[in-house]
């Protein structure tokens, strides 16, 4: 499958690149040599037709294999007309294949007409053929990872894939034709023609490399997820190999542009012929590297992106900006020295000065070593690992007994290091809250599994739940300063939970992110009915401000009927069973550093998923007036957007 995909991509790349080379490079360069142009046009058009035939054959085979893979049937069963017809009609891949087949058929007709075209028709037919080939190449983006995104991300990723393919076609696809022209046409027409072709192609190539670099950065943002994934995942390591080959291709292209092309026009004939031979050799080397790169791209296209896998760090050290003990100005000085040294290398290359080149490289290497020494910190295999378990009340509730059994005896109920077993230790256990917020998720998971406490009897799933409980402890500590005022902002993430309104579908709190504010009301029959009726009366105004009210009972016995008088049934929710005990963790205050037995509890949650305000009495002075609650909602509605609260632990 990988080889078939890579072969098909390579054939389409060569087809589009060859036609683009004819239109934008060869034809303008041979404007004064009509017989040579006609001969080259005939040869390249014939090659394009053969290439198109191979594209059609490989595309048909790829379609059959892919259809069998998607449906889980054998190749023999996948070759039946009925099965293939169903795939063509009922799947996105099939409909895209039909569209690509139509493009290929139109391209075949345009190429046949181009072979017999008169000079007046030639430009139009060549431009049409190139446009159809470019469309065929860009359509391959539909086979990339971009189509798995949604909304705006899908449009951006898909567009970046298409631009990347076009850049590959314009550069790599044109290299075989350039090598052919330099080997056959240039000796016949002259060195002046070779110079014009290479210079035109250099400009063409620089635009292509820029497009490849920019689109590659966008693609990496979606498929990598983080820089450590370049080293810590199979996808990232294969991408590193691709980038290495790309850098080698750029080096050959730079040698052609800055060293050998000037010698074609300025040197004696013998040296010019040597330069022409070097240009051909480097072009063939670029082509060979490009073919291997396409093979790697074919493998990357069918692999799970690094962003969707776990990063396993292979080294005992990593780099961390926050670890710098020296003043940050030292790093800026190192960066300035590196930039100056690189500039010296560029000057040395242009001036052909060995001293400048060697000196610049030495300073750059020294600055790099100094930066690594300053930023290096200990690392573990799980340093960049992310828990697959989201921060939810269900996970926190599962982690609570684990903490009580494994940690509380030394660390205490709230992680202060004041547990009953702490006095028997040589050193007091550390205060957990700052450690939880300051360390990466993967580092915490490693310590949970390898430190003295808890021991390795915990399974992976238990470690993930224990980590979420520790995160809830840290958030509850930060929430001690919450009151009925939404400002100032504090990084207190609201644990996610499921709920159901009447007989409607189950929903998640996280689904309200970016959409509405949430007023979460934990009520009791004895103390909250008047408050619920007041909220129901103000619901139209709350709706206009984008505030959704979710009222859940403190105990099952407190649940009110959906048809209770004066209470809006759209507010009454059946919650996750773990919601009340987990959100009760957020009742600690600066005055009372313990969980308070509440009769009524309200949280105002912003659109990013952060707890912003809290009222722990149905008659709280600030919220007893509905106007004050509405004022807090207006403040949140108008404030500048922040990054959403992480659904997992964030460093």
Give residue ranges: language-model regions.
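Periplasmic/extracellular electron-transfer cofactor-ligation site
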Residues: 394, 404-427, 450-451, 473-478
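Short active-site neighborhood of thiol/selenol oxidoreductases, capturing the structured segment around
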Residues: 286, 508-536
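Extracytoplasmic electron-transfer domains, predominantly the class I c-type cytochrome c fold
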Residues: 424-476
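Structural microenvironment flanking redox-active thiols in thiol-disulfide oxidoreductases
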Residues: 526-580, 651
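The canonical Cys-X-X-Cys-His
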Residues: 286, 291, 399, 404-413, ...
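Polytopic transmembrane helical bundles with strong interfacial aromatic enrichment
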Residues: 1-375, 380-382
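Thiol-/selenol-based redox modules, centered on thioredoxin-like
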Residues: 479-488, 593-651
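Electrostatic cytochrome c docking/interface patches
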Residues: 379-402
């Amino acid at each position: 499958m990988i080889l078939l995909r890579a072969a098909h991509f390579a054939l389409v790349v060569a087809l589009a690149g060859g036609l683009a080379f004819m239109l934008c490079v060869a034809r303008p360069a041979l404007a004064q040599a009509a017989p040579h142009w006609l001969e080259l046009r005939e040869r390249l058009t014939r090659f394009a037709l053969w290439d198109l035939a191979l594209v059609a054959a490989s595309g048909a085979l790829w379609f059959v294999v892919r259809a069998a893979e998607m449906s889980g049937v054998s190749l023999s069963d996948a070759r039946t007309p009925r099965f293939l017809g169903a795939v063509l009609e009922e799947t996105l891949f099939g409909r895209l294949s039909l569209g690509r087949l139509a493009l290929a058929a139109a391209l075949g007709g345009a190429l046949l007409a181009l072979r017999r075209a008169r000079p007046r028709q030639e430009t139009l037919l060549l431009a049409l053929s190139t446009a159809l080939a470019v469309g065929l190449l860009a359509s391959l983006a539909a086979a990339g990872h971009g189509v798995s995104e949604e909304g705006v991300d899908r449009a951006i990723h898909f567009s970046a894939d298409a631009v990347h393919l076009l850049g590959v076609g314009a550069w790599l696809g044109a290299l075989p034709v350039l090598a052919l022209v330099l080997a056959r046409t240039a000796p016949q027409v002259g060195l002046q023609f070779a110079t014009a072709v290479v210079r035109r192609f250099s400009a063409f190539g620089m635009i292509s490399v820029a497009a490849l670099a920019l689109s590659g950065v966008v693609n990496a943002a979606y498929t990598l997820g983080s820089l450590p994934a370049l080293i810590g995942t199979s996808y990232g390591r294969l991408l590193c190999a691709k980038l290495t080959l790309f850098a080698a291709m750029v080096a050959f292209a730079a040698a052609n542009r800055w060293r050998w092309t000037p010698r074609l026009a300025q040197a004696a004939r013998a040296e010019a012929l040597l330069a022409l031979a070097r240009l051909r050799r480097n072009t063939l080397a670029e082509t060979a590297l490009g073919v291997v790169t396409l093979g790697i791209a074919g493998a990357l296209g069918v692999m799970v992106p690094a962003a969707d896998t776990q990063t396993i760090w292979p080294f005992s050290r990593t780099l961390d900006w926050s670890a710098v003990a020296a003043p940050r100005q030292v790093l800026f000085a190192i960066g300035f020295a590196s930039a100056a040294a690189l500039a010296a290398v560029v000057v040395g290359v242009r001036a052909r000065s060995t001293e400048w080149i060697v000196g610049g490289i030495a300073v750059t290497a020294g600055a790099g070593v100094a930066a690594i020494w300053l930023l290096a910190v200990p690392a573990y295999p799980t340093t960049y690992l992310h828990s697959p378990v989201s921060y939810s009340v269900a996970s926190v509730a599962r982690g609570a007994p684990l903490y009580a059994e494994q940690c509380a005896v030394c660390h205490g109920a709230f992680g202060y290091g004041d547990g009953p077993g702490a006095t028997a230790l040589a050193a007091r256990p550390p205060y957990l809250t700052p450690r939880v917020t300051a360390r990466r998720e993967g580092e915490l998971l490693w310590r949970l599994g390898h430190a003295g406490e808890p021991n390795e009897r915990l399974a992976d799933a238990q470690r993930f739940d224990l980590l979420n409980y520790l995160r809830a402890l840290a958030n509850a500590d930060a929430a001690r300063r919450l009151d009925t005022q939404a400002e100032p902002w504090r990084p207190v993430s609201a644990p996610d939970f499921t709920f159901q309104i009447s007989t409607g579908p189950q929903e998640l709190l996280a689904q309200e992110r970016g959409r509405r504010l949430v007023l979460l009301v934990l009520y009791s029959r004895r103390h909250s009915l008047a408050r619920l009726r007041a909220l129901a009366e103000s619901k139209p105004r709350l709706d206009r401000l984008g505030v959704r009210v979710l009222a859940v009972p403190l105990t099952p016995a407190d649940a009110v009927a959906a048809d209770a008088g004066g209470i809006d049934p759209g507010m009454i929710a059946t919650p996750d069973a773990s919601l009340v005990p987990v959100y009760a963790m957020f009742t600690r205050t600066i005055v009372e550093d313990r969980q308070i037995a509440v009769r009524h509890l309200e949280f105002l949650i912003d659109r990013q998923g952060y707890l912003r305000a809290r009222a722990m009495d149905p008659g709280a002075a600030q919220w007893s007036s509905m106007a004050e609650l509405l004022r807090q909602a207006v403040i949140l509605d108008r404030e500048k957007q922040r990054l959403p609260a992480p659904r997992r632990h964030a460093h």
